[in-house]
Amino acid sequence: MDEEPERTKRWEGGYERTWEILKEDETGSLKATIEDILFKAKRKRVFEHHGQVRLGMMRHLYVVVDGSRTMEDQDLKPNRLTCTLKLLEYFVEEYFDQNPISQIGIIVTKSKRAEKLTELSGNPRKHITSLKKAVDMTCHGEPSLYNSLSMAMQTLKHMPGHTSREVLIIFSSLTTCDPSNIYDLIKTLKTAKIRVSVIGLSAEVRVCTVLARETGGTYHVILDETHYKELLAHHVSPPPASSSSECSLIRMGFPQHTIASLSDQDAKPSFSMAHLDNNSTEPGLTLGGYFCPQCRAKYCELPVECKICGLTLVSAPHLARSYHHLFPLDAFQEISLEEYKGERFCYGCQGELKDQHVYVCTVCQNVFCVDCDVFVHDSLHCCPGCIHKIPTPSGI
């Protein structure tokens, strides 16, 4: 009988004496412990890069932003809404830098409703402009996960099978006001192969846990603004494609940008096909632009899917910038600073190595600090030491 309570509560073992994880420094601060948690999260993301795994390179992502009254809380400065919109501006820039042939859209949910801030588009300027304007938005009412997901699904379910369909929810509230059973909607999302991930700003919510688990997404709750930015950065890289997703050759067009001057007698001003959208912010009649090589329809920006013939229009640099996702840089080997016998300076920033651990490239054997290690894997995608060893052609 005495052993029974112990067996029934065995699952609670991971939550016993959690205060022992926290350690104070000389001044009584817990900052060092929190920084250690964030540091381990950075390293984990480097190791989680999917080498030689088929990825969803062409992505369609809807970001759902909670616009309820809880976004006025000031635990993030100056408040949750302003902090979120600023971080999303950074996220949009990074997203299109790493995924130039992908598209993104933004949905805001408040007062039990959902409305589109921007449609799915490959134009980062359009999204950033809308995010800047949304700073003046009033936050009130409760969010509706059901209405937000339904709105995103209505667009995503029509996307081609070879593209990834994703939803990222920034959820501040602890409640959701839905018109119907959200668990039925989760089953529909799973059938439509839409991956839903959630970043919580308050605490873990049961329905979000089920939503992320059933659709193959992730669910995290932020610690602070720095951790918030890290969690958003986690969604910049393309996710692994599911084994059931279609695999097919994609026909693409590579239009050249045509520039015509007013002195050219043959030049005729024309509208961009983007003007088919009533809310388009593109300029009016223009002389130049990108002309579809198949049907000669005109567009002001790339990448885009031709509204006339359906051809995907991109530029060669767009594909080149997507290439590194297929062959990611291997993780550097972590070594204790005491065990490392080489120079005590980082090869990347030339700073003195002071951390407990250093990181060595397994190919060129050069050593890096943790910040350069994360920068090389998240932004540079190639080892500076390995590139330096490549001989320069004699003709240059």
Swiss-Prot record:
Q: Does the keyword Transmembrane apply?
A: no
Entry's Gene Ontology cellular component terms? core TFIIH complex portion of holo TFIIH complex; nucleus; transcription factor TFIIH holo complex
Q: Which intervals hold the zinc fingers (C4-type)?
A: 292-309
Looking up Pfam families in the UniProt record yields: C1_4 (PF07975), Ssl1 (PF04056)
Q: Entry's CDD domains?
A: vWA_transcription_factor_IIH_type
Q: Which PROSITE patterns match?
A: VWFA (PS50234)
Record's superkingdom? Eukaryota
Q: State the NCBIfam families in the record.
A: ssl1 (TIGR00622)
**Protein name, entry field:** General transcription factor IIH subunit 2
